[in-house]
Regions:
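Conserved beta-strand/loop scaffold segments within soluble protein domains that form the structured core
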Residues: 100, 107-376, 380-383, 397-436
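N-terminal amphipathic, basic helical "cap/leader" segment at the start of enzyme domains
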Residues: 1-134, 303, 309
Length: 436
């Protein structure tokens, strides 16, 4: 496909995309798609997901944004933009403006005037990514760019709605590049939706650069359909005294694999990574993390929780790497999981590699069921069995949701998670969910 349609792929794109594309396709052809012989893919068979005859919007046919997909969060002021399939579209922000110097748009527009600004960042973290990253780089035709200059605070949450929308089986290759310069601050909400029951596959590569003293809060919420496959990879580089907080919430999905790699490259950098995955039916949710402590006096904290019902499958593999020069590192990783049926499966692989001697690190993983004694106690006091189950599940999930810093989003997620447990949120209905 690539060789046959190379001219069509290149034509609408900035030269920076085409330059990296040429190198990526060589790396991809050398390895091909991963398979289950690779330990990193042992529990996630991705090769068969690419066997479907997907359409790709190589001709860049525009798709209109409908008001249904505003994805409003009550009581939260946001600045909207969209990625429809894999193309950036500006939102209708009714007179709202981003602070001076902030850029949010398509790399094909921004690179025309600011190639020197984007050049040092695009594909710099993802260059050595796996073959899925190389595939994404080879076929990407657009990239959302968010650039925040030094000493700039973006008060409103920037909300990006990603939507898969087509009348045929569709593949999209999304790309995001986020740059925060020194002492800047922002919060970003990514809402991932699909509005159709066709087979869909999305690869998504996000590169984030958090400059010295800068702070970024990133929230990702997936509400897609059972026919959707999502393969997401997030790369983060942090400089001195920077802070990065990331929460990934999977409410509804089909087949999901997320990988987060954080490189702590400046002393005093701090990262917090949280995840909540709720699965039922035959859903598959795979989360993998790597936090690389390269320098002294950095802090990392991870908390991932899974609630798996029916025949769903969960995978968690988290690695903390403490390099020889990373003395006085503090790192904690926690993974807790509930399997509600004997047919649900959870695979957990916490890892800790320490090559420094003056550090404080811990990690642990548990897999269990709902507390039978607690269920009995609640039923003895008149709470119906199903309601008691929901209350215990809700309390279990609450620890992750409570780590979200934005109050309005935290409140909204409490409601959505409760609906999910009650079976009221069992498939994606588009962003109109957020208005219910």
């Amino acid at each position: 496909i690539f060789d046959r349609h190379r001219e069509l792929i290149d034509e609408p794109c900035a030269s920076i995309l085409n330059d990296e594309r040429a190198k990526a396709i060589i790396r991809f052809k050398a390895t091909g798609f991963p398979n289950r012989k690779d330990e990193d893919w042992l529990h996630t068979d991705v090769a068969k997901k690419f066997a479907t005859d997907y359409g790709m919007n190589l001709g860049r046919v525009a798709t209109a944004i409908h008001g249904t997909f505003t994805c409003d969060v009550p009581n939260l002021n946001t600045y909207h933009a969209y990625i429809i399939n894999d193309s950036f579209q500006a939102g209708e922000n009714k007179g709202k403006q981003l602070p001076q110097g902030v850029m949010l748009g398509s790399i094909n527009d921004i690179a025309a005037d600011s190639r020197d600004l984007i050049g040092p960042y695009y594909n710099r973290l993802a260059t050595n990514g796996d073959s899925i990253v190389q595939f994404n780089t080879a076929f990407t035709q657009d990239c959302l760019v968010l650039y925040i200059p030094r000493n700039t605070v973006v008060e409103d949450t920037i909300q990006i709605v990603t939507l898969l929308q087509a009348n045929v089986d569709m593949m999209s290759n999304r790309r995001l590049l986020i740059i925060l310069e020194e002492n800047s601050r922002a919060s970003l909400l990514l809402c991932d939706h699909s509005s159709l029951q066709k087979q869909t596959l999305s690869t998504q590569v996000t590169e984030i650069f958090v400059g010295r003293g800068a702070s970024l809060d990133l929230y990702e919420i997936e509400e897609t359909s059972g026919s959707n496959t999502r393969l997401g990879q997030l790369f983060v580089r942090q400089e001195q005294d920077s802070r990065f907080r990331h929460s990934n919430i999977t409410l509804t999905n089909g087949f999901t694999r997320n990988r987060v790699e954080v490189s702590l490259e400046g002393e005093g950098a701090e990262t917090h990574i949280n995840g909540l995955a709720i699965g039922d039916k035959e859903q598959h949710i795979d989360n993998r993390t790597l936090v690389d402590h390269k320098v002294p006096r950095c802090t990392s904290n991870e908390l991932y929780k899974y609630i798996l019902d029916e025949q769903s499958t969960g995978v968690f593999a988290g690695k903390m790497l403490i390099r020889p020069d990373a003395q006085h590192s503090v790192s904690e990783q926690t993974n807790r999981n509930l399997c509600l049926t004997s047919c649900a499966h959870m695979y957990a692989q916490p890892q800790l590699e320490i090559y420094a001697d003056d550090v404080k690190c811990s990690h642990g993983s548990t897999v269990g069921q709902l507390d039978g004694n607690a269920l009995f106690y609640m039923q003895q006091r008149g709470i119906p069995a199903e309601e008691a189950r929901h209350l215990l599940m809700y309390a279990f999930a609450g620890e992750v949701i409570d780590n979200i810093q934005i109050e309005a989003l935290r409140d909204r997620l409490h409601i959505l998670v409760e609906k999910r447990f009650r079976g009221e949120l069992n498939r994606c209905k588009g962003c109109s969910l957020c208005k219910q």
